[in-house]
Amino acid sequence: MRQILLFAALAAVLALLLVSCGGTKDKPVPTEEDAPDKAAYQKISAEEAYEMMASQEVVVVDVRTREEYDGGHIENAVLVPNESIGSEMPKALPDKEATLLIYCRSGRRSKDAAQKLLALGYQNVYDFGGVIDWPYELVKEG
């Protein structure tokens, strides 16, 4: 009698498992086309950023402080300190369709700035990290 009860309990548990793991006939599996459009910045290397600067129209955005910028920055970079990026579009970046190449000193602020710029509606945001990893020439003001 005990074996029959144990067998019945095991069969009931197995039946519950099979029912709870039912197929997805009623629900189609989501695909990339079904996913909502989520804007995301792209992380690229300094070398990739350099190639983009040489081959297409881009806006290079330095998100460090004025003092850091004056100490040496990438040629033609626009200064938009990370701390100044808030709920309004930065005046130095009027075109939300422009390709933006973002950098800071080490990569932390550029990541933060890239996320904030996406939230403001910028479409083509690339983060290439910090100027400490920039193997090319920097220019100084003055």
Residue ranges and their predicted role:
Residues 60-62:
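Structural scaffold elements adjacent to functional motifs in cytosolic proteins
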Residues 65:
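Short, glycine/acidic-enriched loop or turn micro-motifs at the edges of active sites
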Residues 2-10, 16-47, 52, 70-99, ...:
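Rhodanese-like catalytic fold shared by cysteine-dependent sulfurtransferases
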